[in-house]
Amino acid sequence: MEPQAAARAVLLVAAAYLIGSIPWGVIIARLTGGPDPRSLGSGRTGGANVMRALGPRWALVSGLLDAAKGTVSVLLARALGAGLEVELLVALAAIVGHSRSVFVGFGGGRGIAPGWGGLLVLQPFVAVGVLPIFGAVIAATRYSSLGSLIGSATAGVVIAALALTGSLPPAYLAYAVAGPALIWYFHADNIGRLLRGEERKIDPFGGRRT
């Protein structure tokens, strides 16, 4: 990679991290006068905790804005002709920014929304295809975290299979491993609570649960 291209890649990854760091859940809570999502449930800023704090309508808004962080990051890299490898890197950087936000003391969400938003640009059919799985798991169990874990793992397996069979460029194989790995890492405490039977449930159709 030439020095100019390398510098552009570094700047795009840094920009994606900062875009990912925008704490929409906290911003919405302040604008609406509602409780800070960090004060409830898991203490995170993502959609599930916004639902606990503000209800499903604002959780949907927060989730869409969080997803847009991944979408915008990848589209920016694509618009600047940075290449596939950089597009994949910025998609991952948005996940990290969302989960380790510089604006809220390196806390944040779990990464599923910006991860899905980036995937929507990179592989839209896979992104849309995992939505029913994500939704079905949450509807059946009321565990948002379990839906995120299974949904991200499913997307990773599908993308890895496509890369291994030559249907996608080889660079996607690393992305298929790194993306779900990051999301699972940021769900580490959820995984522990799931295994102990202590995970918090949500009501995806309207109520608030803690």
Where are these regions (language model features)?
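Short, non-helical or kinked segments that cap or interrupt transmembrane helices
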Residues: P35-G47, F103-W116, Y143-S152
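C-terminal ends of transmembrane helices
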Residues: G25-I28, I95-G107, I133-T141, A188-G192
